[in-house]
């Protein structure tokens, strides 16, 4: 018996083989229509971010380090907005699964109103305390880097209301099953960001440009264009289930729906903010290791995010698929589909990471020609590939759990793993033992490992479906009266 025959017999004996036709239907009819546009959207966002980094990197290493430090704080705020966006996505998907369009519209409208007002308040506070924030984040970075980081932060906080509108509006459209419109809007937004930022930084024709200031200003302008596009799409009813007129934003709020969104969004936002705050703290560890290490760490995260794109798209798709299935009471289907998405992500991402790791130096050369920075990037990308098999259990599974409105478990696990592993292990290995940026990243991988074990256990035990008991017959809930 040759090897191929033996492998064929092993495959034929698995449960997957007997259900391969249903998995094929699931992949092409459920996963692909959702995940591919989300993947393309995320790819466009990240690629435009890479190009933005290129634009800034030509201004020098200090400029790139300044943007990296300011963006490490901006990520905390964007993570909070994305968490509320997730709550909106789940409520919209669940409501439309029950064919309750009115509730989906009200959830979208009220999320947009609340988060826009909150973003204005947040931007005002951060603008006022910007210098103290940068001093805290930048640690022992040079005075020049801190000054550039403060300039970039003060410009980008002006875009927070627009970012909130774009994120929440896009999330609502995805929850309604329309992933193409967010792709077009966010893709166009990022292309505009490159064009506008390029002109503002380096000038056009005889105009010399604004230099470093143009980077933050270009991002802010493009975000407001994206916010206007989202509001216009919702106003004209491009997706009939989410037609929201401009005057409806001034109607009274319905707090029962707000609390439903926040019931998912607040635990998810606490998780995201604590996670990104912990990540920010680890960036502070790196900030004292020199400009080359700061830049190399920033570039390595950018490349790793590109490698993880398919997994991020599958995670977003799993939230929508789970919410839809549970909205119509298909509990077993929700469980089967989450397992399928998880294994698809695990195998796919591991293959991508291992195939791209040998080209880490080539990828780094697109960002910089500094040999010290490139050396840091190569080491970190190889480490990322080594630990990639546990990434999907850490990130795709909790995304699916949130579609089942099981957000609190992910919050507590993230708090434990972030502060118990990433921060503590990163500090001990990176600072106390002198391992440098490698020790900080080993703390991150310890965080992944703890998350992977706890989330995988949650999946196999079925406890993430605790709100949907199988033993009891499904009861029809009386829909509350919702006013638009």
Specify the residue positions occupied by each region the protein language model found:
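Helix-terminus/linker motif at the lipid-water interface of multi-pass membrane proteins
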Residues: 46-65, 134-143, 199-210, 269, ...
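Short runs within selected transmembrane alpha-helices of multi-pass transporters and secretion channels
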Residues: 85, 155-174, 182-190, 215-231, ...
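Small-residue hotspots at the loop-to-helix junctions and early N-terminal turns
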Residues: 61-72, 149, 153, 216, ...
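Small-residue-rich hydrophobic transmembrane alpha-helices
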Residues: 64-124, 163-182, 294-360, 391-414
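Transmembrane alpha-helix boundary and packing residues in multipass membrane permease domains
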Residues: 38, 42, 53-54, 71, ...
